[in-house]
């Protein structure tokens, strides 16, 4: 389906449910897409960090994306991560995603290798010119060790290379500078790239990003509570910033589930992704909360903590 320009609203990065042998659990994934659509989301982002894309084989990636596209059924656009180290490998993923029916692509800067901003620009231009789908840049320096400069993003937005940005840098100052470059809170639609989408990946500061002029959010926690993020977005759209802030504060408290796994026992990604999947299992959406190896599973004590946080947020577990 055609993307709105700019893409806006709540676009969760879809978790990839796994079976007991690590296979993609397509039945759970189909239920998850239904859960997200029932929550009112405006799009779906498959094969991102929250999808555990770095752990998935090419076959698993294809199965997950195919399942999301089929379950979405054209009701909302599906963005597909084409995440890999260098341009030729990203192009392979991009071609596969296009063949499976994705509506847009999401790619990071090259990583493992060290690249100059001009090389990063060439990377995105090659992707856009080779695969005819809208392209979103994914700014996640903690994973790729390169921060996309606001000047570079604005350049690629203005020349039509990029349809949007998913900003997971955590650098709120850089995000604000980019928004100002693009016309500021009230001048975006008449600025240098009126159809360019700026999406924050910082689920704890969505109200602030929307107030600054961002178009939407890509929240990992949105897997668990999509309706909450939609309420936040709708309140901001209506200019009801008090209601938006109240919803944001409830979601901040719920986000504490990501620390359910002790730091002495597992990585922070293992804890966060495990908590999202555990929450979805407790809510009856996923058959299990399995994460990809070698991430460690949450202990029973941690699972109980996730359940307590869900109840406190008004999302009582059914398991």
Regions found by a protein language model. Give the residues of each.
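Short, flexible micro-motifs
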Residues: 12, 25, 46, 51-54, ...
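Short, amphipathic alpha-helical "lid/cap" segments that border enzyme active or binding sites
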Residues: 26-33, 150, 300-310
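C-terminal alpha-helical cap/extension of soluble enzyme domains
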Residues: 6, 11-17, 39, 225-319
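Actinobacteria-biased recognition of intrinsically disordered, low-complexity terminal regions
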Residues: 1, 189-190, 319
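Catalytic alpha/beta core domains of metabolic enzymes, predominantly
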Residues: 129, 141-260
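A general structural signal for well-ordered alpha-helical segments in protein cores
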Residues: 29, 61, 65, 90, ...
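Alpha-helical structural signal in soluble globular domains
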Residues: 39, 63, 67-72, 96, ...
């Amino acid at each position: 389906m055609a993307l709105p320009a700019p893409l806006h609203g709540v676009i969760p990065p879809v978790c990839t449910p796994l079976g007991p042998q690590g296979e993609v659990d397509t039945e759970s994934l189909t239920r998850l897409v239904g859960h997200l659509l029932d929550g009112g989301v405006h799009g779906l982002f498959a094969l991102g960090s929250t999808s555990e894309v770095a752990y998935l084989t090419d076959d698993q990636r294809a199965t997950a994306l195919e399942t999301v596209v089929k379950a979405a059924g054209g009701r909302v656009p599906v963005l597909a991560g084409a995440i890999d180290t260098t341009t030729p490998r990203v192009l392979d993923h991009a071609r596969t995603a296009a063949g499976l029916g994705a509506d847009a692509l999401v790619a990071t800067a090259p990583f493992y290798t060290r690249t100059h901003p001009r090389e990063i620009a060439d990377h995105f231009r090659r992707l856009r010119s080779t695969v005819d789908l809208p392209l979103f840049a994914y700014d996640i320096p903690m994973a790729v060790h390169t921060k996309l400069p606001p000047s570079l993003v604005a350049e690629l937005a203005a020349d039509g290379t990029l349809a949007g940005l998913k900003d997971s840098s955590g650098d709120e100052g850089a995000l604000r500078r980019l928004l100002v470059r693009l016309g500021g809170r009230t001048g975006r639609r008449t600025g240098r790239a009126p159809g360019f989408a700026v999406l924050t990946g910082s689920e704890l500061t969505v109200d602030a990003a929307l107030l600054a002029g961002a178009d939407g959010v890509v929240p990992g926690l949105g897997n668990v509570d999509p309706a909450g993020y939609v309420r936040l977005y709708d309140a901001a759209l209506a200019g009801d910033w008090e209601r938006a802030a109240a919803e944001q504060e409830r979601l901040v408290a719920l986000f504490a589930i990501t620390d359910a796994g002790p730091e002495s026992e597992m990585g922070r990604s293992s804890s966060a992704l495990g908590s999202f999947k555990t929450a979805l299992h407790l809510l009856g959406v996923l058959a299990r909360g399995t994460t990809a190896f070698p991430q460690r599973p949450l202990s029973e004590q941690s699972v109980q903590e996730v359940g307590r946080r869900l109840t406190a947020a008004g999302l009582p577990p059914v398991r």
